[in-house]
Structure formats: structure tokens, C-alpha cells
């Protein structure tokens, strides 16, 4: 029954065990037809359908118990219990300061093609809290019901092979709406858990490609968050970045190959004291946000007080920010819908590329990401055209981690980007 309700939690199992299908609190709906009264005999079938029939002239009696009604009521009770038992999430709108990090996250939600964000900063500065608070703001998307890869019914680029084959054969697939997933990748995850596994025995004996999807499949069209990404094994980081860049994950085992869409926003966070990522890996992240410790005493007091309020009564605290959260969510939805109409002038594109060239940025990722981030910011502000101010806001986050490190240079790389921007755009 737990699988029927779509949950395997112990709380759900406890409810089901304590609530029989014919309990008083959950009475079945009974529909009866009584052309005439009289004694009846009949049989009761599986599923709650009872058809008593009486012999005699013009006498007929049917009674149907709607078990689906009981199951729906139980599902609602389970859903409510699970929502109450989940760990409360700190509201995104309640995060004090850290504007650079919050802006990078919002721009990636608006345009996932920016390529994710790497957040580096001191310990205890709210990196993980801010990323996880983003889950409340994520918009809904259309998916194929029951598909483990969250296939997009309108875009074959993010469809699984099975879904594409069904569409080509003319099958009508059920479509539903669901919130964008946020998947946490633990540091101890194995490559099979991340990429998925192939059942070799079943493939050899039955000739069927039995694939068990991993975290990359679950994160398709969603967000994959890696806390302490600088401590993750290098080969796993390579797998994540390759999948994020190509949008596909390929699993090869014993001559059997399976590919599935894996287009996700990769968000990583870490403490620079624990080690830096390799430059070629840093370059794969679209944006880079630096988080520092708040030095203003008044702000520190406000952060402590807000956190104390949240710890005391999370539900009441979240309710106090409900209006701001909804406003921000509507702003994100509007920006996502308007993004395709936002334009950027050719001369601004030329100046962006000139900044990248004069800073000796390797490759063209810096140019591409800066253009996309500037368009996303313009959409967030409700405009259909990019301005130099938009570029000035995002270009340090798009280029600072792509500059070559000079051990003798004492100036922060973000400052170098800003100086070069004003030199070129002046």
C-alpha cells in the first residue's frame, strides 16, 4: 500500500497501518440502485465492489463501495504529515546581505544555460543556507508523468530515448507539472550512484538494457548542489562538469552504452582555506561568487536575531516572509518568460569581447556567459534591452575565476575585471 500512495516513509506506513480501509473516519462512498426492495444475495469482489442480486420479478440491487475515495483521503493525510515533518527551509527573502551570491543564483534560475555558479567564502557565512533556501523559489515545469528523467514534452533535446520512441510511434503521453528538483550530492557518493548503473546480468540473459538512474538523471532540468565541492574526488568533478557542459550523461559498462539527458544547473560551494579547484574545472562554472564575513555590527546583530526567530518558530517566521517570497517568485517567472525577447546591442557585445581579450581570458566561455548573464539581469529588472550597467554588474562574477593567477599580484581578480571594464566602456 505504501507504494500505491507514492511514499515509503515510516510515518506514512504508520498511518496506513493504523487506518483500515473501512474505518469510521474514512467512510466509502456508496452508490445504490433500488428499483424494489427485498432480500438479496450476492458476491463481494476485490476492490470494494459488491453486487448483491435478488431473484424475482423486476427486482435489482447494486451497491458500489468507492475504495479510491478512501485511498485519496489517506494520500492527503500522508502528504500533510510529510510536509509537516520535513526540515523547514530558511526563506530566501530573509537572507541578510550576500547580494552577490543571491544575484548569481537568481540569474542561473532565470537562464540555466549560464552554466551554474561556484560560491567560495569563509565558513559560517550562509553559503549552504542560501542555496537550499532557493528551493522555495523554483518555478514549476512540464514533465512526462512517470519518467525518471523529467523529460520535457516540448523539447526533444531533454527527452529520454524511451519517451522519444513513444512519441514517434504516436502514443499519447500523460503530462504533469512539478517543481524544479534540487538534488544534493554527498561527498561520499560513488560514480555509480552519480551516473547510474546498468544491470549486466539482465542485459546478457534477457537482452534488455536495464538501467538504474542516478543523481544526474534526477537532476535533469533541475539543480545539482555540491557542498564542499573542492573536497570532492577529481574524477567525480570531471563527470559532473562534463555532463553539465554537454547536457547528456553516458554510462558505459561491458560494451553496453546508455545515454540520457542531464541538463542541470551545477551549484558548488566551498571554503578556500580547504583548497582551490583546478583552473580548468573553475572555468566550467558559469559564474563565481565570493562571500565574505559581515563586518558591520548592526548587520551581524540583525542576522543573529533573525536566526533566533527562525529557530524558535520556523513556521511563523516563514509566514512573515510569505509575501516577499511570492513577489520574488513571480518576478522570476516573469523574467524566465521574457528572457527570449531581451536583446543586446552589437557594440556592447564587441566591448564585452574586448574586455575578455585584454584580460587574456582563455577560450570564449567568458564572452558567452557574460552575454547570457547580462540578458538574464535585464529580464529580472523587467527590461527588454541590456544596458552597460547590467554588464558592469555581472562581468566580475563571469570573469574573475577565468583570469590566470599571478602569485605576485596583490589586487583581487574581481577588481582587475572592474578596472578593465571601465577602461573599455569609457
From Swiss-Prot:
Coiled coil spans: none
Q: In which tissues is it expressed?
A: Strongly expressed in young leaves and to a lesser extent in mature leaves.
Record carries keyword Transport: no
GO (cellular component) term, any one: chloroplast stroma
Activity control, per UniProt: Redox regulation; active in reducing conditions, inactive in oxidizing conditions. Thioredoxins f and m mediate the reversible reductive activation of oxidized CHLI.
Stretch forming the transit peptide: 1-50
InterPro entries attached to this UniProt entry: AAA+_ATPase, CHLI-like, ChlI/MoxR_AAA_lid, Mg_chelatase_ATPase-isu, Mg_chelatse_chII-like_cat_dom, P-loop_NTPase
Is-annotated flag, keyword Metal-binding? no
**Which molecular function term from Gene Ontology is one that the record holds?**
ATP binding
Q: Enzyme class, one word?
A: ligase
- Which reactions are catalysed by this chain? protoporphyrin IX + Mg(2+) + ATP + H2O = Mg-protoporphyrin IX + ADP + phosphate + 3 H(+)
Q: Which GO terms describe its biological process?
A: chlorophyll biosynthetic process; photosynthesis
Enzyme Commission number, as recorded: 6.6.1.1
Q: Which residues bind ATP?
A: 121-128
Q: Which cysteines are joined by disulfide bonds?
A: 104-195, 356-398
Which keywords does this chain's UniProt record carry?
Answer: ATP-binding, Chlorophyll biosynthesis, Chloroplast, Disulfide bond, Ligase, Nucleotide-binding, Photosynthesis, Plastid, Transit peptide
Q: Which domain of life is it from?
A: Eukaryota
UniProt-annotated location(s) = Plastid, Chloroplast
Instruction: Tell me the route in metabolism or biology where this protein functions.
Output: Porphyrin-containing compound metabolism; chlorophyll biosynthesis
User: What does the record note on quaternary structure?
Assistant: The magnesium chelatase complex is a heterotrimer consisting of subunits CHLI, CHLD and CHLH.
Q: Its biological function?
A: Involved in chlorophyll biosynthesis. Catalyzes the insertion of magnesium ion into protoporphyrin IX to yield Mg-protoporphyrin IX. The magnesium-chelatase is a complex of three subunits, CHLI, CHLD and CHLH. The reaction takes place in two steps, with an ATP-dependent activation followed by an ATP-dependent chelation step.
Please give the name of this protein: Magnesium-chelatase subunit ChlI, chloroplastic
Q: Which organism is the protein's source?
A: Nicotiana tabacum
